[in-house]
């Protein structure tokens, strides 16, 4: 078999095919940060701060659909640890907030609206938790993480995507957690076998930045070594930084999939890239940034580049 024939043998899994058929989907960021005016919460915020008065999940979803998007991924829990669903494993959740007198479930509202309007629903759950005292304690935190992951994957119908970033800062005890990624993946494959696992996952790789920059040729067949969660985490955002959000791809990873590169690689995989970029300077809503929303022509340029 020639080198080029070997490259042609690498094929996607059906879940990867289905994802790429979606083409375009929303990444919705909403949590306590929306009310504290922060990009990153630190886990000490009171659930009392979460008090939306006009949340309309159907409006979100119909806006997504009108833009031609076919899916929506919701930040069910960001680094602060606050859960937008009625988690039974923590008190840092909507159940202890004023929203609907503690009876609200934003994940339920958005999932139901997506289903009603024919939009695929996915979940983001940060591996970092700045509120949970178990973070940094190895298996104890992994058990907690899997417990919350199980809640999300068993109570809200079909999930098309599970999105993990590589955030791995310190917890309340000053320790970092070594994530048991393979164990997390096994749970997802068992509970939602059709879901793609993104970024710190085996199905979809990160393009390498949050500014919408990609390589001139973004190949789906790449070396197996690119699926290295430690390397992904190392290159992920570790502090709230505008500079990070605007950075371009670094020189060391400009070419991942040319024939010249792949012919010398012992193992190859189908690992398509995903571009995640915000329409605002950061990911969360801040009133003082309302005049800094990317114009339509810029968004179209990013999409087409």
Question: Model segments located where?
Answer:
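Mature catalytic domains of secreted/periplasmic carbohydrate-active enzymes
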Residues: 1-305
């Amino acid at each position: 078999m020639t080198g080029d024939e070997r490259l042609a043998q690498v094929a996607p899994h059906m879940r990867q095919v289905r994802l790429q058929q979606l083409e375009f989907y929303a990444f919705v960021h909403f949590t306590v940060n929306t009310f504290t005016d922060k990009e990153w919460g630190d886990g000490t915020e009171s659930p009392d701060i979460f008090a939306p008065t006009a949340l309309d999940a159907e409006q979100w979803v119909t806006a997504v659909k009108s833009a031609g998007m076919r899916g929506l991924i919701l930040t069910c829990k960001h680094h602060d640890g606050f859960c937008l669903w009625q988690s039974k494993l923590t008190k840092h959740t909507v159940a202890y907030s004023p929203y609907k007198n503690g009876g609200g479930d934003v994940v339920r509202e958005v999932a139901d609206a997506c289903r009603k309007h024919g939009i695929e629903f996915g979940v983001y759950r940060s591996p970092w938790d700045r509120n949970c005292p178990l973070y940094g304690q190895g298996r104890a935190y992994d058990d907690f993480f899997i417990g919350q992951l199980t809640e999300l994957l068993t109570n809200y119908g079909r999930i098309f995507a599970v999105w993990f970033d590589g955030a791995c800062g310190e917890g309340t005890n000053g320790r970092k957690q070594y994530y048991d990624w393979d164990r997390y993946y096994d749970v997802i494959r068992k509970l939602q076998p059709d879901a793609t696992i993104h970024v710190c996952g085996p199905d979809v790789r990160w393009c390498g930045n949050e500014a919408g920059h990609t390589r001139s040729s973004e190949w789906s067949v790449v070396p197996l070594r690119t699926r290295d969660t430690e390397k992904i985490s190392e290159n992920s955002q570790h502090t709230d930084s505008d500079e990070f959000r605007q950075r371009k791809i670094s020189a060391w990873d400009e070419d991942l999939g040319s024939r010249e590169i792949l012919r010398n690689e012992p193992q190859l995989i189908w690992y398509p890239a995903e571009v995640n970029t915000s329409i605002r300077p950061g990911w969360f809503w801040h009133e003082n940034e309302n005049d800094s929303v990317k114009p339509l022509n810029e968004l179209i340029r990013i999409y087409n580049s």
